[in-house]
Amino acid sequence: VVCSIICAPVFASDYSTGADDIQRCTRYGRKRLGKSRLLAAMTLSTVLYVVCAGVFVALTLAVFGDDKTSAQLALDALVLGNITMNGVLILTLAAGLLSVFAMTAFTLWLSARMRSGVAVLAVTLAVAMTPTFLIVLLRESAVGDWLRLLLPSGGLGLGTGMFVDIQVGKFLTIGSLAIWTPFVMLAAPVIEAPVFALLAQRAYVRREDAALPRKRPRH
């Protein structure tokens, strides 16, 4: 949520104030500026997540100790996987980081396409909260699980996320293929983050191209 609040006005605020008209006139006001903003936003989101994750891990180790977190998670669905609590913690942190990347890129794409930072933030918060609503409204539905896991915020919902899905041990099917839900949660943001980042860059450059005055051909 904090990353979305920070990234929502990255492009949209300049559209609404007209500052982008000035930036387009600069030497590096197009592709390089767009790439720099994308990189800065992704870096800031990464730093914020690492800090929060570090605090979470420190509190977890302080409360439960290393012996507790290294014990094997002996659930029926995970016996064959031989996953320890340390492994669960690593997977949870990895899924969270990937989802932060995907949500940041998604927010930047919306910001590059919309003029209102408030509208961008509203859409982003709705997407961020959707997995929580889906887990409540469509708990036993495979369609609900697919939607929840394929959203950029699939690994960040309240009451959902990697830690919960590992314990539940659900599988989603595509024909005769059964896929463990944590695998979907890890794979989806890996694809979505670069796609939305490229779309954001493309939307920003195309918006600038559309705003530039066209030269009339000389007869």
Where are these regions (language model features)?
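Short, flexible loop/turn elements at secondary-structure junctions
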Residues: T26-Y28, R37, R202-A203
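Transmembrane helix irregularities
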Residues: T26, R113-M114
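Membrane-helix interface/capping residues of multi-pass secondary transporters
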Residues: R30, S116-G117
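Transmembrane alpha-helix boundary/hinge residues in polytopic small-molecule transporters
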Residues: G18-A19, A105, L121
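Terminal transmembrane helical anchor/hairpin motif
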Residues: D66-G87, V118-A122, V127-R216
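Secretory targeting signals
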Residues: V1-D14, K35-R113, G157-W180
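Transmembrane helix boundary and interhelical loop/hinge segments in multi-pass membrane proteins
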Residues: C7-I22, T26, R30
